[in-house]
From Swiss-Prot:
Cellular component annotations (GO), alphabetically ordered: membrane; viral envelope; virion membrane
Function: This protein forms spikes on the surface of the virion. It is responsible both for the binding of the virus to susceptible host cells and for inducing the uptake of the virus by the cell. The interaction between the internal components of the virion and the portion of the glycoprotein exposed on the cytoplasmic face of the plasma membrane probably directs envelopment and virus budding.
GO annotation (BP), single: virion attachment to host cell
Gene: G
Protein's organism: Viral hemorrhagic septicemia virus (strain 07-71) (VHSV)
Compartments where found: Virion membrane
Pfam families from the UniProt entry: Rhabdo_glycop_CD, Rhabdo_glycop_FD
Membrane-topology descriptor: Single-pass type I membrane protein
Topological domain spans for side Intravirion: 483-507
Glycan attachment positions: N30, N378, N389, N438, N459
Keyword tags: Glycoprotein, Host-virus interaction, Membrane, Signal, Transmembrane, Transmembrane helix, Viral attachment to host cell, Viral envelope protein, Virion, Virus entry into host cell
Protein name: Spike glycoprotein
Length: 507
């Protein structure tokens, strides 16, 4: 037991020695009272949505945003100036144009009976596609896919005739402004480092070019720097309208030719005091990877942030219901709305599918009596953002004679039950299926398609019927003729035979 305690103490010392800590004893005259905590606003609504980022997702791909509360107990704050490198989802550098490259086998199967009747079935088979093959085929032109003519052999079943096709489907994906990685729900784990990018569909790769390096324009904001009273350790920086920037594990990194402080979540900031003097000088980062972060990242390891598990549990329950039932209601979908302003994922329903894309969420501080408009933190009144002319809006909103906002409607004593109506979700089809059908079976490597009628397939089913009837009729007629034309046996004679005598003979 004593040895275990000794090794535990040594381990704690090692961890503390390897964790960069920023300490600062702020002058008493600079300490200010900061009462505002990072509270959940009345509502959050998406703005600056990038339409081309919205793609259909399966229920299993839904993800609950992290909910948290920021408590300033035991901290003192000093006013400071913070330079922040913002990441806007509307930036032109945040997208990459490309296309999906498919490799599939179009198969025609023919079965022929004794009488010539034929059954023709068309199917599409997913074909394996290697990364190198995707690279080689990406720059080539490919013909539009088609099924081969059937190969039918008398009294043979399941005669296959295959043809393999490559073809392209245009697709724009998101790009991480920091790491230059490609982001899309269709990718394995939703992220890809370099093109070609493998998708969760076998035989489908995304191919595109990485945009040129781009350095966002920084913004200078007035905020506060927070220090713990007992050890004078700097723990966070806060600016109104932004999520707290944790500094318990902060370090410095060079990006776009400038030295930045990399926060606990990976944001890049600079902290300066009055007159532009530098206030923080953390150690150099061991991990210099820079990637785009948002307001919905994991705050659970930060000591000064308390995760709001009540709201998160509601979202997890909604996710469980949607996944188990294959149905979704506006109320359930509203649980996936980020409750804090900043970059986030927005959802809406379209033709039985859940669409998800990138938006900037802004805080709503007031809603007018008829819910036609909302007021933002800068006292600007705005109209609710709609998805084209659909009645289903972002995060479960329903537009109609009355605007229904599930997270507001749930507080009414008499609420609109329309938000509780569940609708069936349709499967997200394989990309190849758009050429032949609207349904697919993604649970196997075989894409099932029903019999696809065409001119020649119809003729193949008609003539065997006529020929079969002719064969049967001819055989019956031949049997009748054979029976009728067969020679009859001689008729037996039962009379008394008469003898023939010569004329000269007297009887």
């Amino acid at each position: 037991m004593e040895w275990n305690t000794f090794f535990l103490v040594i381990l704690i010392i090692i961890i503390k020695s390897t964790t960069p800590q920023i300490t600062q004893r702020p002058p008493v005259e600079n300490i200010s009272t900061y009462h505002a905590d990072w509270d959940t606003p009345l509502y959050t609504h998406p703005s600056n949505c990038r339409d081309d980022s919205f793609v259909p997702i399966r229920p299993a791909q839904l993800r609950c945003p992290h909910e948290f509360e920021d408590i300033n107990k035991g901290l003192v704050s000093v006013p400071t100036r913070i330079i922040h490198l913002p990441l806007s989802v509307t930036s032109v550098s945040a997208v990459a144009s490309g296309h999906y490259l498919h490799r599939v086998t179009y198969r025609v199967t023919c079965s022929t009976s004794f009488f010539g009747g034929q059954t023709i079935e068309k199917t599409i088979l997913e074909a394996k596609l290697s990364r190198q093959e995707a690279t080689d085929e990406a720059s080539k032109d490919h013909e539009y896919p088609f099924f081969p003519e059937p190969s039918c052999i008398w009294m043979k079943n399941n005669v296959h005739k295959d043809i393999t096709h490559y073809y392209k489907t245009p697709k724009t994906v998101s790009v991480d402004l920091y790491s230059r990685k490609f982001l899309n729900p269709d990718f394995i784990e939703g992220v890809c480092t370099t093109s070609p990018c493998q998708t969760h569909w076998q035989g489908v790769y995304w191919v595109g070019a990485t945009p040129k390096a781009h350095c966002p324009t920084s913004e200078t904001l007035e905020g506060h720097l927070f220090t713990r009273t007992h050890d004078h350790r700097v723990v966070k920086a806060i600016v109104a309208g932004h999520h707290p920037w944790g500094l318990t594990m902060a370090c410095t990194v060079t990006f776009c030719g400038t030295e930045w402080i990399k926060t606990d979540l990976g944001d890049l900031i600079q902290v300066t005091g009055p007159g532009g003097t530098r206030k923080l000088t953390p150690n150099k980062c061991v991990n210099t990877d820079i990637q785009m972060r948002g307001a919905t990242d994991d705050f659970s390891y930060l000591n000064h942030l308390i995760t709001n598990m009540a709201q998160r549990t509601e979202c997890l329950d909604a996710h469980s219901d949607i996944t188990a039932s294959g149905k979704v209601s506006s109320f359930l979908l509203s649980k996936f709305r980020p409750s804090h302003p900043g970059p986030g994922k927005a959802h809406y329903l379209l033709d039985g599918q859940i669409m998800r894309g990138d938006c900037d969420y802004e805080a709503v501080v007031s809603i007018n009596y008829n819910r036609a408009q909302y007021k933002t933190m800068n006292n600007t009144w705005k109209s609710w953002k709609r998805v084209d002319n659909n009645t289903d809006g972002y995060d479960g909103m329903i537009f109609g004679d009355k605007l229904i906002i599930p997270d507001i409607e749930k507080y009414q004593s008499v609420y609109d039950s329309g938000m509780l109506v569940q609708r069936n979700l349709v499967e997200v089809p394989h990309l190849s299926i758009v050429f032949v059908s609207n349904t697919s079976d993604l649970s196997t490597n075989h894409i099932h398609t029903n019999l696809i009628p065409s001119d020649w397939s119809f003729n193949w089913s008609l003539w065997p019927s006529l020929s079969g009837m002719g064969v049967v009729g001819g055989a019956f007629l031949l049997l009748v003729l054979c029976c009728c034309c067969k020679a009859s046996p001689p008729i037996p004679n039962y009379g008394i035979p008469m003898q023939q005598f010569s004329r000269s003979q007297t009887v």
